[in-house]
Structures are given as structure tokens and as C-alpha cells.
From Swiss-Prot:
Residues 141-150 have a biased composition (Basic and acidic residues). Its main location: nucleus. InterPro entries: BOP1/Erb1, BOP1_N_dom, WD40/YVTN_repeat-like_dom_sf, WD40_repeat_CS, WD40_repeat_dom_sf, WD40_rpt. The keyword 4Fe-4S does not apply. PROSITE patterns: WD_REPEATS_1, WD_REPEATS_2, WD_REPEATS_REGION. This is Ribosome biogenesis protein BOP1 homolog. It comes from Drosophila grimshawi (Hawaiian fruit fly). One of its GO terms (cellular component) is PeBoW complex. WD repeats lie at residues 447-488, 490-528, 572-614, 617-655, 658-697, 701-740, 756-786. One of its GO terms (molecular function) is ribonucleoprotein complex binding. Residues 1-11 have a biased composition (Basic residues). SMART domains: BOP1NT, WD40.
């Protein structure tokens, strides 16, 4: 049978209003104590299970008793006994304090609650003083089975959630127009999203903008209440979120600190607790038997055995044994690379194709001082039988070098990266899209008997002039390849340069220690006559030249014999001239004498027939010089570096670092912002003068020394000539946008020259108008590529 406990509840009869007022006056003095007691002992709640406050009021002043089961169902009325009266009086005294608090807290809200609740289910609370004081207790009515059990209460926290997608990242719905689904499986459309201007206007106009947040589940904007703001402030200030929580409540001693003399449990001990353990007896007997038989050893004996097994200890004096290098050498050894197996060339009777012919033997002997350049470190030999093979003379040396490699060269494992070759190659435009540029050889100018060192083109592009080691200067017609005039000199012609001024017809020829200014007598006759009139007489000058300049250079008119050949002015230097170059206007020209020390570079003015030495100290062995096409700047190239000087301020502007062994030549872009440098160590260097003093790009397109390099005056082209008999034409576009880097694309390799005495192409020069290029070589020819 289900046990039912009778719950006694007392219902008190109503009292008059005056009596209630007198009770409230008596409780005013104890207000603070009642509030504190209410916090400590909240008392009973008058709310039933279904959330409706109900009160029962009797129709008489007698005390009534009711019985109810554990579920709160009404069982009936019962008379109170004497023992129950005493217990009820004690309960009433405790409940009076609770009634005072309830009256103060709900005094203002009772009248409103009366209007809201039905008249049949509510009654007024009454308070009395005396021994028979009682409180009104709510009697739960029976539930109507026709209504839902949880009609007026929330049964789940999830029923209020509109979006049913669950606890997932909401950015999954960024690409969709909806943000989830409601309880009816309908899409929750995202609210319209404003731009930054709308947000700014709302921030200005809406006073509640600062407390508006966006719900990530629905995308709607939620207005935070005052309670939410207070909660956020408390959390932000590191306080307890619940404001009703008292951090300083009186300590409640749940467990006593006094030592209890009586035991917690009063269970008599078992009989076996007084008897010795049988299992321990067996264990001890086994240990005694093991000691007698010698199987079991003492602690000292065990430590002694461990010490003998470990053996003597050795310590590293300078490093630990747990280092990475020690572990690698012990646990991850790297085996020595094996020597290559012998091939057919190392046989005592190799096939005939592996034996050297005269040309291969000469090439092999040529690298006697540089054996690392040889394809084979030995010369294959053929013997009739194995017994005729002599002892190998380099056996001990090779074994010695092998031993050095084994114990001196560090070993390491390298992870091979599988990188596609196309990924490493930069994406460049197709050469077909970069036309026009020279692709074929059109003409060969033959006539010199020795290597041709220099070539220069007339400003109008009709004639060329060449200088050779056969001590002659030849003038050629470009279109026909016919030699118009040959001028003999007394020494080797190192350099020729046609004046860039189209109003003058002058050629500067560097031969030995003399610089000849020649009128070629080709082209317009009026222009030829004007040039002769200009160079006929020396202009008067009041400037007194120093002895330093007089000993270095002397101006003079040509002899009558040379006048007939076209020579007009002779400038004699104190050292052999290597290079001559013109200024863009055609009035100044510079010469280079590598052996001249601090007077290696000289600048000559044609109109005033005077010279000047720009440098008083030698900064190195000068190789070549160059004028800036626009600015009054002077480029001086030594063996390793290039210095740029301002001729007006007479100061050093910039020093370019080439990181090369020996500079052979240089050429400047027509705009003057980029410089090309050729070196004898097979490199071409592109300098961006506005970017850095180091090369913007280093090109290694040739297999041998690069002797000459040149920019085209009109087209974005440049070319280089090398001792590998090749002329490489490249595309070099320089953009007006300073933020865009130059575009460099190799286009064509023209290799038609013949190699003589280890020399190939000696000089290259562009046609001033057409995309044509002239090259001179050691094969005594001049070749035109178009």
C-alpha cells in the first residue's frame, strides 16, 4: 500500500482592518531584522505547482485541520489534538516572522493581484498576534484532465528558439539568402542589411543604438534591457553577475570543529579482525623459504648486482651525450658516397671513339692550369694486352684526396624537392609579339686583313666606319657593302666613333697614342665643306693651360700627307688610347688611357681645342667612360665598380657595385635611367639608377667573356657580343611608370662569326634608325643582321 503522510495545514479566519493595522505598527521597528531573516530563511512559497497563487479562508474563527497526501491532494477535515496544538503553536511563532516579510514585500502588489486573479480562487491574507496566530496556506485544486499539463509554464528552453539549425557556425549560411529554419520548417530570410551610411545615420539618430546587438541565430537586432546592461557591466568589472548574491554571508558551520568522542558508527567489529591474516601468513612463509633457498636477495645485494651490470661510468668533459649531433652520429649515420664505376674510357683497350684525336688532345692540354674544366681527368690510352698496362702514376694522389673527402667533408641528407621546371621559369611574352628585331645575317663586309676591333654608324644610317689591327680605317656603304675609302694609320686602331651630331661629318679614331679627327668626305658636300671650315684653323684662346695638361695631351693640325687622307686634327696623348666616346651634342669627346694613372681619362672640347683632366687622383684602373645622354653626368668604369660624377658640381653622385672581376664595357639607355654593363666573367648587369646601387638583374647568357654591349636608340632592344662567337639580341622595355620594373626578354642568338685565337665577337653597334645590328669579329669581317 502506498503510504500517505498527513500534512497539517492551518487556515485562519479573517480579522478586522484595525487589527491588521495594529500588527503592521508593531512590525515596523523590526523591519531590518525581518529583511535579514527573510534573506536567511525565505520561508514557504504560496505558489502552487501550476504557478497560480491561491489562498483559502475559513468562514469561522476556529482552527481547522486538513489532511493531504504527498502529491498535495485533499483528504478531508480533521480535529486537532492536544499534542498537535503545541506543535502548531511553535510553528505559528516561527511563521509570524515569515508573515511580516511577506506582508512588506507583497503589500503593494496584493491589490493588483486581486484584480487579476479570479474571485473564486483567491482570498485575503490576515495577520494576528497571540498564541493562536496562523497563516493562510494555499490549497492546490485538482487538475482538469481536459487541459494540458504544462499550459501556463515553459517546459523547455528550446521552445523559444526560432532557428532550429542547432549549435553550428552561422557563417555556413553566408552564401544563402536565408539563415536557417523555424519550427514549421520554413526558411528564415535574412533581414535587409544596410551599408555604412545607414549604420552611421542610425548611430546619430537612434538613441538606443549603443545597446542594440545582432542575434547570430536569426540575424535580427535585439535591444538589450537594463538588466542585460547591468549584467554586462558587472561581468566587465570582474564582479559576480548575480546582484542578489551576498558575498559576505555569515559562515555556516556545516561540520563541527569539535572532536566527537562518540564513534560515527556503532557497529560491532567482526571476529576476523582479531585473528591474524591467513593470506599474509602464506606470503611470509614463501618469503622465508625464498631466503633459505637463496632466491630472494636483500636490497644491498640487488644494488650490488645492478652496479656490476652497469659497469664503469664515463662522462663527456666538454658536451653532453644527449646533443643532437651525438644522436645523429650514432642513430642516423650518413654513409659515404660511393665512387663512380669506371667507364669504357678507362679501359686498357677502349673503343676507338673514346680515344682523343688531335683537336681533343689540344683542348685537353690547354686546361693544364685549370684541370677542373676538363671533361675527363685523364687521357684514354690503348694497350694490346693487360700486362702492358703501366702503374697508375696518380693512384696515391687520388686515394689521398678520397681520404680527405671522407673525413673532412661534412655529410648531410638533403630532401629532394619535386618542383616542376615550368614553375621556376618566369612567364615571359612570346618573341613573336616583340618584333621587329634582327633574326638573320644579311651582309658580310670583307676587306680587313686582321681582327676588326671597332665599328661605328653614321647618324643618318648610310655609312659605317671600322677600325682594325691591320692599321687601317675603312668606310663602308651599308646598303651595298662596298668599301668607299681606306685610311691607313701608323698604329693599331683600337676604337672608332662617328660624331653623333648630324650637322658635322667627323670620325674620331684612336690609334696608338694619337687621336685622329677625320673628315670621311662622304654624304652631303655642303656638310663636308662646313666640317673642313670648322677644323681648318684653331680658335684663339686666352686660357693658359697648366703643365700637367700640356705634358698629357697636345693639339695639332695634320700633316699635308694626312690632310689628303682626310685627317684634319691630331691630338697626341702621352699613353696609348684604348677608348674614345662622344657627347650627345658632338662638341665634347672623352678618351681613356688605362696606363695613365690619375690622368687616365681626358675630356676634349672640339670648338675651343682644349683638354681637361677631370680627376686628380686615381680610383682604380679605368676601363671605359661614358657621357649621360641628358644630364651633365660622367660615368667612369674601373675594373670592379662604376662611379657617376656630376660635371657641374664636380662631385661624386653614386657608386655602382658590380660584384664582378673585370668590366669590359657599358652602355646607357637613351632615357638615361638604366645602365648595361658587360664583364669578362660572362655576365651582363642591368642597373636601375633610380632603384639601387646593386644590379637589378644579372644575365648569364654567354659561355665566354662578354666584350661589348649596346642599347638601341629608338627600339627597346639591346645586344651583346662575346668570345663564344655569338651575338644575343634581347628585348629591354623601360616603362614611364616608375612603379613598373623593366621587362627583359632574350630574343635571338646570332652565331655566324668564326673563332680565331680564342677571340670571337669584339664589338656590336646598332643602326640609328632601323632594327639592324653590326658586329665585328676576330675573323676580319663585319656582319649585318636584319
Amino acid at each position: 500500500m502506498a503510504k500517505k503522510s498527513a500534512i497539517k495545514r492551518k487556515v485562519k479566519a479573517p480579522e478586522s482592518i484595525n487589527e491588521q493595522a495594529s500588527v503592521s505598527e508593531q512590525s515596523e521597528n523590526e523591519e531590518d531584522e525581518d529583511l535579514l531573516q527573510a534573506v536567511k530563511d525565505p520561508g514557504e512559497d504560496t505558489t502552487d505547482d501550476e504557478g497560480i497563487d491561491q489562498e483559502y479562508q475559513s468562514d469561522t474563527s476556529d482552527d481547522l485541520l486538513f489532511e493531504s497526501d504527498e502529491e498535495g491532494n485533499y483528504l478531508g477535515r480533521k480535529e486537532a489534538s492536544s499534542g498537535e496544538d503545541e506543535q502548531g503553536e511553535e510553528d505559528d511563532n516561527d511563521d509570524e516572522e515569515e508573515e511580516d516579510e511577506d506582508e512588506e514585500e507583497s503589500g503593494s502588489s496584493d491589490d493588483d493581484a486581486k484584480d487579476d486573479q479570479p474571485s473564486g480562487s483567491k482570498a485575503t491574507l490576515s495577520k494576528t498576534t497571540g498564541d493562536s496566530s496562523n497563516i493562510a496556506v494555499a490549497i492546490p485544486p485538482r487538475r482538469d484532465p481536459s487541459k494540458p499539463e504544462y499550459e501556463n509554464s515553459d517546459t523547455s528552453d528550446e521552445e523559444d528558439i526560432r532557428n532550429t539549425v542547432g549549435n553550428i557556425p552561422m557563417h555556413w549560411y553566408d552564401e544563402y539568402k536565408h539563415i536557417g529554419y523555424d519550427w514549421d520548417a520554413k526558411k528564415i530570410i535574412k533581414p535587409p542589411k544596410g551599408d555604412q551610411i545607414d549604420d552611421f545615420l542610425r548611430k546619430i539618430e537612434d538613441p538606443d543604438f549603443w545597446r542594440t546587438v545582432k542575434d547570430p541565430q536569426t540575424g535580427q537586432e535585439v535591444l538589450l534591457t537594463d538588466e542585460d546592461i547591468a549584467l554586462i557591466k558587472r561581468v566587465n568589472s570582474a564582479r559576480i553577475p548575480n546582484p542578489e548574491h551576498n558575498e559576505y554571508e555569515p559562515w555556516i558551520e556545516w561540520f563541527s570543529s569539535q572532536v566527537e568522542k562518540m564513534p560515527i558508527k556503532n557497529v560491532p567489529d567482526h571476529k576476523r579482525s582479531f585473528l591474524p591474516s591467513v593470506s599474509e601468513k602464506k606470503k611470509v612463509s614463501r618469503m622465508v623459504h625464498a631466503l633459505k633457498m637463496g632466491w630472494m636477495k636483500t636490497t644491498e645485494e640487488v644494488e650490488r648486482d645492478k652496479q656490476q651490470k652497469r659497469g664503469p661510468k664515463f662522462y663527456m668533459l666538454w658536451e653532453t651525450d644527449t646533443g643532437r649531433e651525438h644522436i645523429r652520429r650514432i642513430h642516423d649515420p650518413v654513409s659515404a658516397p660511393k665512387r663512380d664505376l669506371p667507364g669504357h674510357a678507362e679501359s686498357y683497350n677502349p673503343p676507338p671513339e673514346y680515344l682523343f684525336d688531335a683537336k681533343e688532345m689540344k683542348e685537353w692540354l690547354k686546361y693544364k692550369d685549370e684541370p677542373h674544366k676538363r671533361k675527363l681527368h685523364f687521357m684514354p690510352q690503348k694497350f694490346k694486352s693487360l700486362r702492358e698496362v703501366p702503374a697508375y702514376s696518380r693512384f696515391l694522389r687520388e686515394r689521398f684526396l678520397r681520404c680527405l673527402d671522407l673525413y673532412l667533408c661534412p655529410r648531410a641528407k638533403r630532401v629532394k624537392l619535386n618542383i616542376d621546371a615550368e614553375y621556376l621559369i618566369p612567364k615571359l611574352p612570346s618573341p613573336r609579339d616583340l618584333q621587329p628585331f634582327p633574326t638573320v645575317e644579311s651582309l658580310v663586309y670583307r676587306g680587313h686583313t686582321d681582327l676588326v676591333r671597332s665599328v661605328s654608324v653614321e647618324p643618318k644610317g648610310e655609312y659605317i666606319v671600322s677600325g682594325s689591327d691591320d692599321k687601317t680605317v675603312k668606310i663602308w656603304e651599308i646598303a651595298t657593302g662596298r668599301c668607299i675609302r681606306t685610311i691607313e694609320t701608323n698604329d693599331v686602331v683600337r676604337c672608332v666613333a662617328w660624331c653623333p651630331n648630324a650637322k658635322l661629318s667627323i670620325i674620331a679614331v684612336a690609334t696608338g697614342t694619337r687621336l685622329l679627327l677625320i673628315n670621311p668626305k662622304v654624304g652631303d658636300k655642303l656638310l663636308v665643306k662646313k666640317t673642313d671650315d670648322l677644323l681648318a684653323e684653331a680658335p684663339s684662346s686666352d686660357v693658359i693651360e697648366s703643365e700637367r695638361i700640356k705634358t698629357a695631351v697636345q693639339w695639332s693640325n695634320a700633316e699635308p700627307e694626312e690632310q689628303e687622307k682626310g685627317v684634319r686634327v691630331v691630338i697626341t696623348h702621352f699613353k696609348p688610347i684604348r677608348q674614345v666616346t662622344w657627347h650627345g651634342r658632338g662638341d665634347y669627346l672623352a678618351t681613356v688611357m688605362p696606363e695613365g694613372a690619375n690622368r687616365s681619362a681626358l675630356i676634349h672640347q672640339l670648338s675651343k681645342r682644349r683638354s681637361q683632366i677631370p680627376f686628380s687622383k686615381s680610383k682604380g684602373l679605368i676601363q671605359c667612360v661614358l657621357f649621360h645622354p641628358v644630364k651633365p653626368c660622367f660615368f667612369v668604369a674601373t675594373q670592379h665598380n662604376i662611379r657617376i660624377y656630376d660635371l657641374v658640381k664636380q662631385e661624386l653622385i653614386k657608386k655602382l657595385l658590380t660584384n664582378s672581376k673585370w668590366i669590359s664595357g657599358m652602355s646607357i639607355h637613351p632615357k638615361g635611367d638604366n645602365l648595361l654593363v658587360s664583364t669578362y666573367d660572362k655576365k651582363m648587369l642591368w642597373f636601375d639608377l633610380d632603384l639601387s646601387t646593386k644590379p637589378y638583374q644579372t644575365m648569364r647568357l654567354h659561355r665566354n667573356a662578354v666584350r661589348s654591349i649596346a642599347f638601341h636608340l629608338r627600339y627597346p632592344l639591346f645586344a651583346s657580343g662575346s668570345d663564344d662567337q655569338a651575338v644575343i639580341v634581347s628585348h629591354g622595355m623601360v616603362y614611364n611608370d616608375l612603379l613598373q620594373n623593366p621587362l627583359i626578354v632574350p630574343l635571338k642568338k646570332l652565331q655566324t662569326h668564326e673563332k680565331r685565337d680564342e677571340f670571337g665577337v669584339l664589338d656590336v653597334n646598332w643602326h640609328p634608325v632601323q632594327p639592324w645590328i653590326f658586329s665585328t669579329g676576330a675573323d676580319c669581317t663585319i656582319r649585318l643582321y636584319t
